[in-house]
Amino acid sequence: MDNSLLSEIWRQSLAFPWLSAVILNSFLLALAAIAPKKLLTPWGYGHAWVLGVIIWAALGWRGYLVVLAYFFVGSAVTRIGQKEKEAAGIAEKRSGQRGPENVWGSALTAALCALAIAFGPEPWQLWLALGYVASFSTKLSDTTASEVGKAYGKNTFLITTLQPVPRGTEGAVSVEGTLAGFAAGLALAVLGYGVGLISFGGIIFSTLAAFIATNLESVIGATLQNKWPWLTNEVVNGINTFLGAAIAIGIEATAQLI
């Protein structure tokens, strides 16, 4: 295939973003269906297709690369120390395969930011792009902190009381998990800057928001999650990513006023 044809295909994809999004994600879904290693459940793949269409059509390859990075890195860290976590009864269900509830618990905030960028007022787009990156930075930070903490945390304590608790306890944190989570959130923010979705300052805002939101999520887990049956891990994840996006936007808005 020569360069002129590739250029024409690329121009057409930009001219018809929703159509190209459907074609691209259908192709990737077909590849996933025949891949020997399944990272999602069958329904999870269907919902991921919807998410992928939204992200590609609204944000193009830049936004798509961010969500792919979150998905593959998040799936990889979930499998860290898998056998040990399964033996202790603290591993993710379905051996880490994600279902629809996981897809939207992790990405609903990002999808709404992407749709708002595509259809909302132009003055909001820079803030919404920051919210998009920060939501995934937050979720990757949370996932990494949790999985590394469960696998390698030497001392695990409840965030609200600092009392020692077993690994995998809701609201538990560890030094190892916290540091790994911070690094993961920073890495995702750097990627967002690298593809041009956020400014250099956005790296700081996104990383700081991810750190704050991840710890707030631990507080929710320690204080409320066991009291309210409807407050599932997926609902908490949705709250977590919303907080990450909102905090990042709030920090940037405050910085602009100073």
UniProtKB/Swiss-Prot annotation:
Keywords: Cell membrane, Membrane, Transmembrane, Transmembrane helix. It is a multi-pass membrane protein. GO terms for cellular component: membrane; plasma membrane. It comes from the Bacteria. The chain crosses the membrane at residues 14-34, 53-73, 110-130, 185-205, 238-258. It is found in: Cell membrane. The keyword GTP-binding does not apply. Belongs to the TMEM19 family. NCBIfam families: TIGR00297 family protein. This is Uncharacterized membrane protein sll0875. It comes from Synechocystis sp. (strain ATCC 27184 / PCC 6803 / Kazusa).
